[in-house]
C-alpha cells in the first residue's frame, strides 16, 4: 500500500463529488495535484495543493474550495482530522486504524514493500564504469561504479528491466601505448635490463605478470618479430589481463555487469558498424563535407583546418557540428560513439543511461544529439556525471598519483574500510556534488558514520527478536502472526515510525524518476535515526520498550513494527548494494 497514491485517489474521488468540479472537469488538470508529506509533521500526515491548483480554473477562492474538499474528506473513516492552512493547503491527519492496516501491509510485503510498477517492464540500459583497460581501477572510478550499480538496482526495484553494461575502450591509441609497456616487461622477463620506464609508457608493476606470462608462452619468439606482428598478440593478452583485473576489482565492490562490450567490435570487418552508422545518418541528411572554424580556447583532438566528414549535430541540439571522418580517411573517436549508440538502439533499448566522470561534461550535448539523430527522437538518453572524490585521513588529504605507477586503487580502499563503507558513502552525496571520503570517519562507530548508523539499526532490529525469544520461551511468530497483532500499535511515537516507513514507496518512485540513488541512502539514514530515537525513548519510558517480558501480546505487536523497520532497511540497503547485518560487534 502506497499511502500517498492511495490518498491521491481518495482526494480525486472527493473532487469528483463536487458539482462545480464535475461541471468543468474537462478544463481541469488533475495531474498538477500533489499529495505528499507536509513540510512540518505537526501539521498532519498528508498534505495536498488540490485547492490551490484548481481554484483559478474553477473561478473560486482557494480557501473556499479547500473548505468544500475538506467537508468531503471528513466523510472518510480513515481521516481523523483535516484542516486548511495558509492560502489553501489542505493538511490531513490519519486515523490510528489506517496506520495499523498500513503496518500490516508492510509486514505482509516484507522486503518487497515499496516495489513499484513504475517502469512497466520497460528495459533500461545502464552503462557505467567503462574505465580504460590500462590498469587496476583507482578510487576515481569507484563513485561511478557505485552510482551506476545502485541506480540499476533502484530501477529494477521500481519495475524496470535493467541491463548493466561496461564499454571496453580497447581500440584507442592508449592501448597501443599499453601494449608497448607490456612488451617492455616481456623483454624484462626474458632477462633484459630495461632500466627506467621511458616517459609516455605505463610504469606500473601490475604489468610485470603480463610480461612474464608472454615470456613463458612465447619465449623469445615475440622478441624477434617486428612490432606490427607482435602488437596484436600482446594487445589481446594485455586487454584480457587488464579486464580480468578490473572484473576482480569490481567484484570486490559487489559490482557485476551483464554485458562487457568491446569497442574493437565496432572497428572489426573494416569498421563495418561505424560505416553503417554513418551511412544511416547520411541517408537522414545529417552528414556533410565541411571545415569547422577553430573553437575558442583549447583545440580538441579531432579539430582540423581541412575538410572533414561532419555530423550536422547542431540540428539536433549540439553546440557545434562534430567530425566523423578525418581528412586522412580515418574515423574519429566520436564516430565510434555514434556506432555504439546505434548498436544499443538496434538491440532494442529506447532508454539508456550513461554514468560518466565529471571530465566528460563536454560529451553530454553531443551524446544527446547522437541519440536524437540515430533514433529519430525515439530513444531517451540520460547522462549522469559523477564529480571527483577527495580522499582524507583524519582530515588530512591523501595524495593519489597514476603517472608514477603508485596510486590509491579501488581495492586499497575496499580492503582498508570494507565494501559496505565504500558503497554507502559513495551514495551519501548527490553524484553531481564533490565527495570527501575520510578513511577515519567511515570506520567510526557513531551517528556521524552513516553506514554504521544504518546497519546498526538493522542489527538492533534483529537483536529485538533474540531478546523476545529469551523473554518468552518457544516464541515463534510468522509475518502473518505479526500482521494480525498490529492493533497493539497505537502510541503516537510508534505511529510516527509507521509514518516514516510509509514514505518508502514514494521515495523509491521519486528516486527512480529523477535517477538519484542517493535519495535511498538519505532516507535510510532518516529511518535509522527514527528507529534509534524510539529505541532510546524506551530507556526512559518502559511502556515503549519493544520487549515487555510481562506482556506477550504487546511484545508481538511491537515485533511487527520492528519486522517492518528491518524489512525496509534490508531492501533499501540491498538497493545501495550494502549488507544488512544481523549482528555488529
Swiss-Prot record:
Keywords: Aminoacyl-tRNA synthetase, ATP-binding, Cytoplasm, Ligase, Nucleotide-binding, Protein biosynthesis
Motif interval(s): 'HIGH' region: 131-141
EC number: 6.1.1.19
Any coiled-coil regions, as ranges: none
MF GO annotations: arginine-tRNA ligase activity; ATP binding
EC category name: ligase
Localisation per UniProt entry: Cytoplasm
GO CC, alphabetical: cytoplasm
Main localization, broad class: cytoplasm
UniProt xrefs under InterPro entries: aa-tRNA-synth_I_CS (IPR001412), Arg-tRNA-ligase (IPR001278), Arg-tRNA-synth_N (IPR005148), Arg-tRNA-synth_N_sf (IPR036695), ArgRS_core (IPR035684), DALR_anticod-bd (IPR008909), Rossmann-like_a/b/a_fold (IPR014729), tRNAsynth_Ia_anticodon-bd (IPR009080)
Entry's Gene Ontology BP terms: arginyl-tRNA aminoacylation
Catalytic activity: tRNA(Arg) + L-arginine + ATP = L-arginyl-tRNA(Arg) + AMP + diphosphate
UniProt subunit comment: Monomer.
Entry's family note: Belongs to the class-I aminoacyl-tRNA synthetase family.
HAMAP family, A to Z: Arg_tRNA_synth (MF_00123)
Protein name: Arginine--tRNA ligase
